[in-house]
């Protein structure tokens, strides 16, 4: 093969969302000749020397690229990741970590679709069956009925985690795969919620929803429904925090109506003082197993609070969440134990995907290499992951 071009090495690393330091660690590039691993990698990217094949193989694995990609003459154009619902057309924001994550998701989706087609799965009629000019209450009822969602059961959950598990089961029961992914396999590559909150990939055979698990757990249910509405509309794309885009407002309104019907917000008085609003919204959200941000957004949309009040509340709730997140991180660091590798992985990929991969392996329709690719683990970890899932019911 021809020589590897330095710009290809740099492109592959940057589109994988890795810094020089993280990439050097990922490919196990050790210090040598007075240079750190990161400095050696930087030299390779400047064309100081050709990387040995062994290093290229490690790069292919760490950067999630086929080996042949490192012999391209020039970096290819960015792949289609669907619509960017976070901003107006022409103002899309590029983030290498997010781009790498979506490329990984798309690759998994292709394998999932292949497994489903081998099993002769029927197309899902609801995907792309709705339009954004449908009245919000009508589509909300249609989606909730299709899910057979009972708000009483959702709210009877012990907390936000259990409520999300109930909703996730309902969504996956309709043929949609719900994944929790917020990095490229390591906390070093965490993608902030400010970059993306959720992703919907529309397909009538293998529709996918991805939720950024860096977000508050109380927000996961709303994000799942928001992305599900995108699937009903036949949309593929990235969702963020800003709801300034019309289609995002519509999906927010439908998701919000499913979880908290507008009639339930009538008890909130207009003109609440800030501290009163914080307490009332917090109590209301806790009782319904939803996020305070969602409730305050609905109050804004209904004209029950001003935009300035909503902005102040959003800032306050976000600061409290960041403080809570830091406390939880400190607890985990101090604790001796914690969730095992397989418990965490099971939770991220969901019971529906675990079940599909298990059946496909049993029927000989997929290799362990491809199964690992779909589940986001190495081939040798597939069987322990599936076995532990079967023993514990997949949750």
Question: What do the PLM-derived regions correspond to, one by one?
Answer:
Residues 1-395:
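Active-site hotspot residues in diverse enzymes, especially metal/ion-binding acidic/histidine motifs
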């Amino acid at each position: 093969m021809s020589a590897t071009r330095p710009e290809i090495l740099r492109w592959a690393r940057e589109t994988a969302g890795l810094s020089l330091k993280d990439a050097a660690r990922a490919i196990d590039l050790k210090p040598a000749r007075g240079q750190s691993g990161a400095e050696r990698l930087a030299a390779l990217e400047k064309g100081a020397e050709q990387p040995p094949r062994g290093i290229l193989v490690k790069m292919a694995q760490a950067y999630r690229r086929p080996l042949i990609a490192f012999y391209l003459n020039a970096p290819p154009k960015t792949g289609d990741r669907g619509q960017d619902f976070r901003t107006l057309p022409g103002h899309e924001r590029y983030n290498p970590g997010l781009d790498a994550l979506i490329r990984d998701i798309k690759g998994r989706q292709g394998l999932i679709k292949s497994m489903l087609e081998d099993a002769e799965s029927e197309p899902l009629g609801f995907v792309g069956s709705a339009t954004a000019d449908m009245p919000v209450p009508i589509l909300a009822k249609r989606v909730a009925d299709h899910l057979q969602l009972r708000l009483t059961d959702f709210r009877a959950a012990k907390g936000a985690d259990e409520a999300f598990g109930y909703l996730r089961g309902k969504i996956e029961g309709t043929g949609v795969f719900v994944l929790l992914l917020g990095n490229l396999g390591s906390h070093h590559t965490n993608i902030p919620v400010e970059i993306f909150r959720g992703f919907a990939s529309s397909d009538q055979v293998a529709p996918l929803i991805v939720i950024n698990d860096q977000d508050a757990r109380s927000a996961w249910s709303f994000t799942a429904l928001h992305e599900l509405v995108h699937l009903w509309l036949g949309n593929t794309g990235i969702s963020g925090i800003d709801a300034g885009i019309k289609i995002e407002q519509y999906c927010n309104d439908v998701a919000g109506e499913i979880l908290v019907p507008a009639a339930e917000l009538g008890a909130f008085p207009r003109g609440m003082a800030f501290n009163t609003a914080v307490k009332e919204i917090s109590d209301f959200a806790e009782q319904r197993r939803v996020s305070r941000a969602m409730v305050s957004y609905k109050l804004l949309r209904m004209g029950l609070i001003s935009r300035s009040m909503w902005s102040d509340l959003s800032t306050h709730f976000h600061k409290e969440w960041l403080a809570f997140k830091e406390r939880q991180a400190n607890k985990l660091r101090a604790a001796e134990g914690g969730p095992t590798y397989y418990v965490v992985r099971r939770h991220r990929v969901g019971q529906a995907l675990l079940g599909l991969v298990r059946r496909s392996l049993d029927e000989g329709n997929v290799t362990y290499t491809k199964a690992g690719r779909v589940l986001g683990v190495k081939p040798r970890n597939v069987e322990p992951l599936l076995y532990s899932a079967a023993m514990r019911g997949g949750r």
